[in-house]
Amino acid sequence: MNKTKIYINGKLIGTCDNPEEFVEEIRAKRRSGEVSHEMNITHYPENHEIYIFTDPGRARRPLIIVEDGEPLLKEEHLEKLSSGEMEWDDLISQGIIEYLDAEEEENTYIAMSPEEVTEEHTHLEIDPSTMLGICAGIIPFANHNSSPRNTMEAGMTKQALGLYASNYNLRTDTRAHLLHHPQVPIVKTRIIDVTGYDERPSGQNFVVAVMSYEGYNMEDALILNKASLERGLARSSFFRSYEATERRYPGGQEDRFEIPEKGVRGYRSERDYRHLDEDGIINPETEVSSGDVLIGKTSPPRFLEEIDEFGTVAERRRETSVTVRHGEEGIVDAVLLTETVEGSRLAKIRVREQRQPEFIGDKFASRHGQKGVVGLIVSQEDMPFTEDGVVPDLIVNPHAIPSRMSVGQVLEMLAGKAACMEGRRVDGTPFTGEEEKDLKEALKANGFESAGVETLYNGITGERIEAEIFIGVAYYQKLHHMTTDRIYARSRGPVQVLTRQPTEGRAREGGLRFGEMERDCLIAHGAALALKERLLDESDKYEALVCAECGMIAIYDKIRDKKYCPICEDSESFPVEISYAFKLLLDELKSLCIFPKLVLEDKA
């Protein structure tokens, strides 16, 4: 018989002969309070291993213990809890409820409801929705969705705009988003109640129609009602903070907040400094755009200057002002002046920008993993409308539902519609929420089709749309992926010092990468001159002088106006167009003591 190895927090500490008895005894001691209730034990019989975990930071959740087919939590316990005679900790210390981690759940058989409990079951869920975390717990009717959609939504909830902190006005976060009119979801769950999500929601209730519209909502694109946006739907503010410090340097030199003078090295234009006050700092509520100076600042030179004719060192300060980022604009929201721990002056400027979905490309998502970007913003008069004159805020494509099996969204729209007609909020808690048939009856009682479909009319022609359109109310979240932050174009701009190629990235006003696959497309088309233009002329074209004898890159002495080869000296050299990156490669090969020789031929 194989001995079973025992591990504590992954470390082998011994073996035992009767693993089942050992595990049962340890669990009994935990339930009686002899061993800490924060310990978990798991037996893997196929591997002959027992794992005991006491590590901090493990995810654990409470379950009701079942013995001989009977849950240990009785009606009398619930009454005592309600009256205050008992507390939650008493249930744990009395061995009625225990916390299990993911490892110990491997040894359990958990019943979802008291009716399901049999003698084989070891535990019972307090409520089926407790198996979900906070992010998954706010999804209504999550048990009707496929699991990848729920996982997707659990990630996207964290990206949704809302009231991220109630003291946002006093904070200077590097970047922050704030939704102007967050609403509590009409279809809620019990986890929403428990976590206080209603106090700081992160979305709005949209009237949603499921239909195609002129092909503009293909591939998860969304169509938004322009009038709804003008009334404040999905409107948000974006805050960005900038800061600068008057640093002190060895030798008594220091930075200064001021409006730089024209003699300062790196001086911009007068227009860039037009918003600054006398102290070099901008005033609140000033409109600013890309490149405007927010904090005027000068710094001492990095190196000592040459001694002038009077034998003194002339200090020529350099410009180090803080400017609005490239591609951003807004209004100065707040100016904070304070000191650092070292006693240096510190200035922080918060700029706010109002964001309304004006462009296509802003990202939205329902609570069922149905994410999409705005494909078209339509005037209200061109939107389809119902017999009662209701115009949807949002149109989603019907192809988004069947293959993804997000039936929870269909139920939420049904429940949202019923809730609006009855003036109440619907409980969409997974497994235990309101039944579909009750929602359908509520719709029927209010004069609607029980399936949630309605007749819609074309807003452009006024004709009745042949198909019945499913329309309801769903909670949608605006995510922080916005076109304003992503859109980018460049004609001319800075280049890198080393390679002389355009810089990379939107923040550095970089070029758009013309990659290998784009190059292959032009090769396939046979567009040789277009290829040369992209990869040479518009990138890092360099005219090198090449020695006709030895093939080494020659030198041009500007003072003497003379070309010569460093090896052959007086030999003839010719200009050759090459990429500067290639010239850099030749230089690096020389540093490795490899002599790259360029062989020149006459042009064909």
Swiss-Prot record:
InterPro entries: DNA-dir_RNA_pol_su2, DNA-dir_RNAP_su2_dom, DNA-dir_RNAP_su2_hyb_sf, RNA_pol_bsu_CS, RNA_pol_Rpb2_4, RNA_pol_Rpb2_5, RNA_pol_Rpb2_7, RNA_pol_RPB2_OB-fold. It comes from the Archaea. Pfam families: RNA_pol_Rpb2_4, RNA_pol_Rpb2_5, RNA_pol_Rpb2_6, RNA_pol_Rpb2_7. GO terms for molecular function: DNA binding; DNA-directed RNA polymerase activity; ribonucleoside binding; zinc ion binding. Zn(2+) binds at residues 547, 550, 565, 568. The active site is at 348, 481. One of its GO terms (biological process) is DNA-templated transcription. Keywords: Cytoplasm, DNA-binding, DNA-directed RNA polymerase, Metal-binding, Nucleotidyltransferase, Transcription, Transferase, Zinc. It is found in: Cytoplasm. GO terms for cellular component: cytoplasm; DNA-directed RNA polymerase complex. Binds 1 Zn(2+) per subunit. It is an enzyme of class 2 (transferase). Its cofactor is Zn(2+). It catalyses: RNA(n) + a ribonucleoside 5'-triphosphate = RNA(n+1) + diphosphate. Its EC number is 2.7.7.6. Part of the RNA polymerase complex. Belongs to the RNA polymerase beta chain family. DNA-dependent RNA polymerase (RNAP) catalyzes the transcription of DNA into RNA using the four ribonucleoside triphosphates as substrates. The Rpo2 subunit (Rpo2N and Rpo2C in this organism) is implicated in DNA promoter recognition and in nucleotide binding. This is DNA-directed RNA polymerase subunit Rpo2C. The lineage of its organism: Archaea, Methanobacteriati, Methanobacteriota, Methanomada group, Methanobacteria.
